[in-house]
């Protein structure tokens, strides 16, 4: 079987069995098994999910990183390898990232004796929940690493092409939560209440001025309001 065929099969297996952030136990076992079969060394970091492998010898170390978690989304695609886990799917392509990194590991293993140093391969959990990188850092996975490289699939590019540039490329993410307290009233007598819906709607619009007025126009920033809901009544 060719490397391409192997990676396609692995990607489809991962796609069929997606796991949410910090729940990627079966995914980790699959990756571990595939790496063991290729005689790739796995480093003994204490991680609940995710793993770190290493190829090569020497003092110099660089790292390659891929994310492995999925999203809480129901898959609607009608393909033979669609998700078998209700309400969970690899909607962001982390099955692709993991397969690509496995392919890199296999190719690097074939050239291990010619490498001028070590390549540390990070399979990061919990990218979607914004905490997985910290678990690797706290475990010591980046000790002595001089540089780290990652990638993300880009459906807008033609197959077989990749893009890069100097400077920042992909973003760091921060979350914010706002709570707006109002006072209920009859729809025909809004003056007797405090309309939280109106205020929230205005706030969403005003927040967009942060990107256009508070940030240097030469810097890249995106501010999105992803969800608006009312408190559940007990």
Where are these regions (language model features)?
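Histidine/acidic-residue-rich, glycine-tolerant segments that coordinate divalent metal ions
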Residues: 51-52, 71-73, 79-89, 96, ...
């Amino acid at each position: 079987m060719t490397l391409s065929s192997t990676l396609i099969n692995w990607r489809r297996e991962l796609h069929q069995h997606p796991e949410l952030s910090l729940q990627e136990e079966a995914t980790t076992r699959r990756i571990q098994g595939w790496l063991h079969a290729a005689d790739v060394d796995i480093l003994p970091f204490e991680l609940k999910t995710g793993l770190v492998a290493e190829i090569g010898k020497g003092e110099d170390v660089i790292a390659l990183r891929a994310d492995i978690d999925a999203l809480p989304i129901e898959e609607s695609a009608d393909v033979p390898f669609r998700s078998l886990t209700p309400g969970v799917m690899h909607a962001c392509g982390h099955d692709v990232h993991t397969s690509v990194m496995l392919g890199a590991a296999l190719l690097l293993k074939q050239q291990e004796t010619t490498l001028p140093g070590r390549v540390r391969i990070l399979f990061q959990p919990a990218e979607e929940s914004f905490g997985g990188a910290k678990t690797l850092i706290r475990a010591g996975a980046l000790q002595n690493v001089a540089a780290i490289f990652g990638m993300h699939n880009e459906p807008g590019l033609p197959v077989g092409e990749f893009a890069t540039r100097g400077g920042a490329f992909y973003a760091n993410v921060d979350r914010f939560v706002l709570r707006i307290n109002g006072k209920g009233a009859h729809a025909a007598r809004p003056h007797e209440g405090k309309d939280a819906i109106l205020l929230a709607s205005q706030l969403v619009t005003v927040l967009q001025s942060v990107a256009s007025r508070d940030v240097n126009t030469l810097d890249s920033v995106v501010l999105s309001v992803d969800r608006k809901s009312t408190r559940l009544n007990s």
